[in-house]
Design a protein with these regions (language model features):
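ATP/NTP phosphate-donor binding region
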Residues: 1-48, 54-63, 85-101, 111-120
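Catalytic core of DAGKc-family lipid kinases
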Residues: 18, 23-24, 76-155
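A residue-level signal for conserved active-site and pocket-lining positions in enzyme catalytic cores
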Residues: 46, 74, 126, 225
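Short glycine-rich anion-binding loops that position phosphate/pyrophosphate groups of nucleotides
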Residues: 50-53, 76-78, 162-165
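Short, conserved loop/helix-junction motifs that constitute active-site signature segments
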Residues: 63-66, 176-177, 199-201
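Proline-centered loop/turn at the N-terminus of a beta-strand
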Residues: 67-71
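ATP/nucleoside-binding phosphotransfer catalytic cores, i.e., glycine-rich phosphate-binding loops
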Residues: 120, 128-129, 133, 143-148, ...
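Gly/Ser/Thr-rich active-site loops/lids in small-molecule metabolic enzymes
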Residues: 150-153, 157-194
Length: 265
């Protein structure tokens, strides 16, 4: 969901920088621009780094139940979630004019073959992957209705708009605009059903993956970078109580980048 983003007024800002040399140099360069405060005391956070460090920061905030607006400056490679980096203290002016885009993580509740249950959050995607040479067989249920009785292949994933340009896109899934309020359900190297290429679901959907014959065909579940092995079932839905807000410059051509990414080669 997109929210109005002009007229921001932040008096307490946190500065977070990735450990790369370039990001550390940028942090030193803007260190005197304002009196930075710890993340827990801030009204908003400025993040220096790439998309990977931005995701780490977002997970840190989700785990701590912090809901500060986040303004990223790209000092990495792609910088899909970041704004263009420029030197100097103008970042404070840009913050005041930034527009807001709200993003919510997926909540994964996974049940292992032993019956243990664990929960994790995923900003990008949750993927189920075969653990051995045996083809994974997975039942897919959407809103308590079985949609695919048996998906045979390497696995399946459910991606948020934030994650739709990552693993999902590599698996031939669709790229979703950040404010689309949709989810991408994408098979990974499917064998059967041969013609099913995935689905785009409203982000209020509840999705369940049930592993068929899990002893013979073990499957792992990965929520971003957290992995659980020997899965029996995974239940997924958007967790709106952990919503985060990303800040983008008004001239940040995010929609153009989403379109361009689909024609990259």
């Amino acid at each position: 969901m997109t929210k109005a983003g002009t007229g921001n007024s932040f008096t307490r800002l946190a500065l977070l920088a990735s450990p790369t040399e370039r990001a550390q140099e940028a942090a030193a360069a803007i260190g005197d621009c304002t009196d930075w405060v710890p993340l827990e005391q801030a009204e908003a956070a400025v993040v220096l780094g790439g998309d990977g460090f931005m995701l780490e920061t977002m997970h840190r905030m989700i785990d701590a139940a912090l809901q500060l607006p986040i303004y990223g400056l790209n000092l990495g490679t792609v910088g899909f979630l970041m704004n263009r980096y420029t030197k100097g203290c103008r970042v404070l002016e840009r913050l005041a004019k930034a527009r807001r885009i709200a993003v919510s993580p997926l909540r994964m509740e996974a049940v292992t073959q032993s019956g243990a249950t664990q929960s994790f959050y995923a900003i990008n995607e949750v993927s189920l992957l075969r653990e051995t040479r045996q083809t994974a067989k997975i039942e897919i249920t959407v809103n308590e209705r079985v949609r695919i009785a048996e998906l045979a292949g390497d696995g399946v994933l459910l991606a948020t708009p934030v994650g739709s340009t990552a693993y999902n896109y590599s698996a031939s899934g669709p790229i979703l605009p950040l404010d689309s309020q949709m989810l991408a359900l994408t098979p990974i190297s499917p064998f059967r059903p041969r013609r099913w290429k995935g689905a785009i679901l409203p982000d209020r959907s509840r999705v369940t993956f049930r592993v068929l014959d899990p002893k013979k065909r073990p499957v792992s579940a990965v929520a971003d970078q957290k992995e659980l092995r020997d899965i029996a079932e995974v239940r997924l839905q958007i967790e709106r109580s952990r919503e985060l807000t990303l800040l983008f410059d008004p001239g940040h051509a995010l929609d153009d980048r989403i379109v361009a990414e689909q024609f990259a080669y």
